[in-house]
């Protein structure tokens, strides 16, 4: 079993406790090239551990902003990083990685780009020393980028893919795993090919679907948009992403994303055919099977601790006044129920909202009883 596999299967991946005690695995300077959301978030967490973080980026303004936010310091004479993390857009990742490999011959270099096959192939084509390069990718992010959106806890509990390859011979190759663990993430080993196929399915194709669905809203009547509830908001939540960045990501993983979307297109064609002739034999079965297949797929998504878990939802009415949501969350904690997920939905034209609280089924009855006893209006509960 590899080091990263041991970490994620032996309890070593339970990193939150390690972070709160201030322990760390990385020893030595870490150089972060890139001062956006990921680069600055990496710097913020490592600085909390006392790591000497060196920030560098092509934009002096962006770099200075990240430094001001406490994500690291400016480069200085005598720097000797043991690990270099490249956090730049995908279209320049291989170029910057090659430069860093040449500039720091005693350092391991990793990147956090959202594709892994293309950078490795480009580095080999450049003749770069890939024995000291390991691609990686944290499955974490936010809708808005830049250092101003950075968070020290961005990676806590999130998968961090380590995409190794056969040419790695560097003696301190485990430093990428140490980085992931110090950031609170769970290291997962994959080949570059496995990674790119996986993210095409769970990240890249969903971005396209969200954007295309949101496009349908551009010219929709105001009256129709006024009916929007949580369903359309869930489907389009990531549609506000950066077009320039996503053009690079999709282009770098084009064939794999196209394969997923081609399967989706075939399913959509079947649904459209059924809707155009709803009374034709088999049409209603097609519709039912489409919805049912989706039930099966979403049930396979892991919960926040990585396991596949069925949660119960308790829907609570919350007044749209300052402090009400905070009071609800505080009282759920006082009751002793662990919150697995939370969704909010505002009723158009009403001074209230609905909080959908996800919990393990065994705690549903107790939570409903305790909340109602404390004066909350529970409008529904279901598995």
What are the residue ranges of the model-derived segments?
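A conserved regulatory-domain signal marking ACT and ACT-like small-molecule sensing domains
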Residues: 297-383
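Glycine-rich Rossmann-fold phosphate-binding loop(s) that bind the pyrophosphate
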Residues: 35-36
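Rossmann-like NAD(P)-binding element
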Residues: 77-108
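Rossmann-like NAD(P)(H) cofactor-binding subdomain of soluble oxidoreductases
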Residues: 96-147
């Amino acid at each position: 079993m590899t080091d990263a596999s041991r970490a994620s299967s032996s309890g070593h991946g339970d990193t939150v406790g390690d972070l709160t005690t201030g322990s760390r695995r990385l020893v030595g300077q870490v150089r972060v090239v890139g001062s956006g959301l990921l680069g600055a978030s990496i710097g913020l967490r490592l600085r909390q551990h006392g790591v000497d973080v060196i920030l560098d980026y092509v934009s002096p303004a962006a770099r200075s902003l990240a430094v001001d936010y406490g994500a690291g310091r400016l480069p200085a004479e005598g720097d000797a990083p043991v690990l270099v993390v490249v956090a730049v857009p995908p279209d320049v990742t291989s170029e910057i990685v090659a430069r860093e490999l040449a500039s720091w011959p005693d350092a391991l270099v990793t990147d956090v780009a959202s594709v892994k096959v293309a950078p490795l192939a480009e580095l080999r084509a450049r003749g770069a020393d890939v024995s000291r390069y390991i691609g990686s990718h944290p499955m974490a992010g936010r809708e808005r980028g830049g250092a101003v959106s950075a968070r020290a806890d961005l990676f806590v509990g999130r998968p961090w893919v380590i995409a190794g390859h056969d040419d790695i011979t560097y003696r301190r190759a485990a430093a990428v795993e140490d980085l992931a663990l110090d950031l609170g993430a769970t290291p997962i080993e994959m080949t570059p090919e496995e990674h790119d196929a996986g993210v095409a399915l769970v990240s890249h194709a969903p971005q396209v679907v969200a954007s295309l669905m949101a496009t349908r809203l551009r010219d929709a009547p105001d009256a129709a948009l006024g009916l929007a509830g949580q369903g359309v908001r869930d489907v389009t939540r990531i549609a506000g992403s950066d077009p320039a960045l996503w053009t690079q990501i999709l282009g770098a993983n084009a064939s794999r994303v196209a394969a997923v979307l081609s399967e989706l297109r075939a399913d959509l064609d079947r649904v459209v055919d059924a809707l155009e002739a709803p009374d034709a034999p088999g049409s209603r079965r097609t519709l039912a099977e489409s919805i049912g297949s989706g039930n099966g797929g979403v049930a396979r998504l892991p919960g926040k601790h990585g396991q596949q878990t069925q949660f119960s939802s308790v829907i609570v009415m919350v007044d749209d006044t300052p402090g009400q949501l905070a009071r609800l969350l505080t009282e759920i904690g006082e009751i002793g129920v662990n919150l697995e997920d939370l969704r909010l939905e505002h009723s158009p034209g009403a001074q209230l909202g609905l909080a959908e609280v996800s919990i393990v089924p065994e705690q549903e009855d107790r939570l409903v009883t305790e909340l109602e006893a404390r004066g909350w209006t529970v409008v529904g509960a279901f598995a």
